[in-house]
């Protein structure tokens, strides 16, 4: 039996089957993208709910795996050379799983196109949408200074325009369905939660809307959106 006791996180979130990949996450866009990838791959894994509370993400056990105190993180008991490996950062996890299985990243030009759009999401779409959500829906909503809100709403509009142009003639950003789509689309879906579709001009981006609909039609996506359960 695989022994994961060297990973301190397993003391707080104990694995039922240590031979399975362990997912430590919560169903936010960054968490969803990894759960969706695991569902698409059909890999056996064990999800552990890590809430966004300090009691979880700032616990010594979680920090031992991710010193940046953010979900998601994984332990793969069958890592390189057959040895367990722990990883954090959703983009890195997606690339690791794609390379491990040889799926959803492509080869040659498509591989680099996939990496390009994955990095676009990690560096732009996710951070800008997240900050916009803070200022239009969450704790920053009550801040009187309009400039932060205007800044992030404006950047969200710009990024939607970039994606709208990219999708001209494409169903998926890298040609074939890939980890880049798994990274991008959950953040588009978050606009509903932020109640921000109207302010970013969603209806003016029909290709983006159709792209999100295609993504949400996938059975693995529907499963992954709710893993781990919020309950």
Regions found by a protein language model. Give the residues of each.
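Residue-level recognition of oxygen-bearing side chains
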Residues: 92, 207, 220
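Short, solvent-exposed turn/loop segments enriched in Gly/Ser/Thr/Pro and often Arg
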Residues: 51, 179, 228
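Phosphate-coordinating loops and pocket residues in cytosolic domains that bind phosphorylated ligands
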Residues: 64, 217, 226
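GST-like domain detector, emphasizing the conserved glutathione-binding G-site
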Residues: 1-147
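C-terminal helix/juxtamembrane-tail motif
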Residues: 222-231
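GST-like fold's C-terminal all-alpha helical module
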Residues: 118-217
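Active-site-flanking alpha-helical
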Residues: 98, 187-188, 225
